[in-house]
């Protein structure tokens, strides 16, 4: 609990790298876990970025675990994307699992403060990192987090996995939603996630369409 982790970059190095990337039109994707790491990243971003709205690079912070309310406010002001992995909650955030073992029962409620972030207006982009890969698992734990105060609705979680990711990749004109003119990338589930959000992780994909072509059909004879 007393260990704050290992910083791979000091502030001056990080700020120099961020400035060089930003000035050359390169999108930043900064890995930061822990309040101290996030504080350093946010402070550097505040020094580097112009006023919000002047850039289309859509810089983002990866993971964002253990954000404080003040840090969330500052990220919102910078219009930086929060790239997060709600599947971590299902893997490590349940009672007795790694988060509680390392940080104690009082701290674990806000390790992944999805509700606070969504309410602040920050764009959420969800992904899997290295485990487990299935997005339905991540959607499930964003909606059914152990602490009600940090739960999202099914619509919010699905949007973060679809339009949120597309926006983070500057690809929302091509993918992320089912609209005329966009690529036909979609799935059909065996149940409606809006009717019973408590069973999302157990729902099965019946049909997968990629770029307009059926690539998986569970019941095809």
Predicted feature locations:
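Active-site-adjacent helix-turn-beta-strand microarchitecture at beta-sheet edges
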Residues: 1-22, 72
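Extended hydrophobic secondary-structure segments that form protein cores and membrane-embedded regions
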Residues: 59-65
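His/Asp/Glu-enriched, well-ordered alpha-helical/loop segment
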Residues: 18-29, 36-59, 84-198, 203-211
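Acidic, glycine-rich active-site loops and adjacent beta-strand->loop/helix elements
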Residues: 65-67, 88
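Short amphipathic alpha-helices and their capping/turn segments at secondary-structure boundaries
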Residues: 67-81
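Residue-level structural signal for beta-strand termini and adjacent loop
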Residues: 220-221
């Amino acid at each position: 609990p007393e260990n704050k982790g290992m910083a791979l970059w000091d502030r001056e190095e990080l700020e120099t790298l961020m400035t060089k990337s930003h000035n050359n039109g390169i999108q930043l994707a900064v890995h930061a876990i822990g309040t101290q790491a996030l504080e350093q990243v946010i402070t550097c971003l505040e020094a580097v970025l112009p006023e919000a709205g002047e850039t289309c690079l859509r810089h983002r912070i990866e993971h964002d675990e253990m954000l404080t309310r003040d840090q969330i406010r500052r990220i919102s002001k910078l219009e930086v994307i929060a790239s997060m992995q709600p599947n971590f909650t299902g893997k490590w955030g349940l009672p007795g699992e790694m988060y509680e073992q390392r940080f104690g029962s009082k701290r674990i409620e806000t390790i992944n403060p999805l509700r606070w972030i969504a309410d602040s207006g920050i764009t959420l982009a969800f992904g899997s990192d290295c485990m487990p890969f299935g997005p339905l698992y991540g959607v499930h734990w964003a909606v059914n987090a152990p602490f009600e105060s940090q739960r999202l609705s099914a619509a919010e979680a699905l949007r973060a996995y679809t339009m949120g990711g597309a926006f983070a990749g500057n690809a929302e004109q091509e993918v992320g939603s089912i609209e005329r003119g966009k690529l036909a990338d979609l799935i059909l589930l065996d149940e409606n996630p809006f009717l019973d959000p408590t069973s999302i992780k157990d729902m099965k994909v019946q049909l997968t369409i990629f770029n307009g072509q059926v690539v998986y059909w569970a019941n095809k004879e």
